[in-house]
Amino acid sequence: MQSKLLLSTKLTSQGKTQLDQYFVSPPFKVMTLPAYDDAWQNGLNAMQMSSSPGLLAGDLLDIEISLADNTALSLNTQAFTRVQSMNEGDYATQKTCIKLGKNSRLFYLPHPLVLHKDSGFKQTTEIEMSEQSELIYGEIVAIGRVLNGERFAFRHFASYLRISYQNQPLVTDRIQWLPAKMALTSLSQMEDFSHQGSLTYVNLAKNAVEIKAMVSELQALAAEQKNMLIGVSQLNEGGLMVRVLAHRADIIQHLFERIGQVLKAQSNIV
């Protein structure tokens, strides 16, 4: 199965964000949602949906998202993405390309990815920022169907994230998990946790002092959480990263949604 999702935004004469170009092939679908109380006023809320029960060997998902200048998009997904069992040497693949226009804002938090026994999955995410643009991007991965006693039974997971501005890298994050060859339960790895989450925030309108204050606020929020291991780090330029280990996916997702609201509220783009 080769599936494509293509969407872009535009700004109306009333200053509201709307879908512009929109193309999907099965099993993808996108549904726009009613406006709700949010710090990004006049932004567009949308849900990325899929009718597939999971990814199979040879599946390729191609996602392209483009935000026009001065638009804002909050994009969530409908359900967990499950990578099903497959033969040795087989993989499912996802490629995501995102471009943010000047003064644009994107909040993108897909549901967790679940790696089933004997699965192989490779994903690449490339995001290009523009002047004064803002990004809140999250990823959550489960090491297996934990409630079924499945832990690190997948074959291979590879993830590459690159965020750049004017073709210069701002963030590069690479994950390689090979359970048969790596001690993934050791100290400084997953230890006894079953879910990992990463949330990256980049705002090119913020200076280092402002970002540092936001890091301190999120560290205070992290200290209130139970049954999670949380780290908040300031990026070299214009942003921060939150890394979380936990025993359940939903608590990471709820935390990231809460952090997203905190970060949106401090946006200085009108």
Swiss-Prot record:
Gene Ontology annotations for the cellular component aspect, listed alphabetically: cytoplasm
Keywords: Chaperone, Cytoplasm, Nickel insertion
Localization (cell): Cytoplasm
A Pfam family assignment: UreD
GO molecular function terms noted in the UniProt entry: nickel cation binding
Reported function: Required for maturation of urease via the functional incorporation of the urease nickel metallocenter.
Entries under PANTHER family matching the protein: UREASE ACCESSORY PROTEIN D
SUBUNIT field: UreD, UreF and UreG form a complex that acts as a GTP-hydrolysis-dependent molecular chaperone, activating the urease apoprotein by helping to assemble the nickel containing metallocenter of UreC. The UreE protein probably delivers the nickel.
Family: Belongs to the UreD family.
Name of the molecule in the record: Urease accessory protein UreD
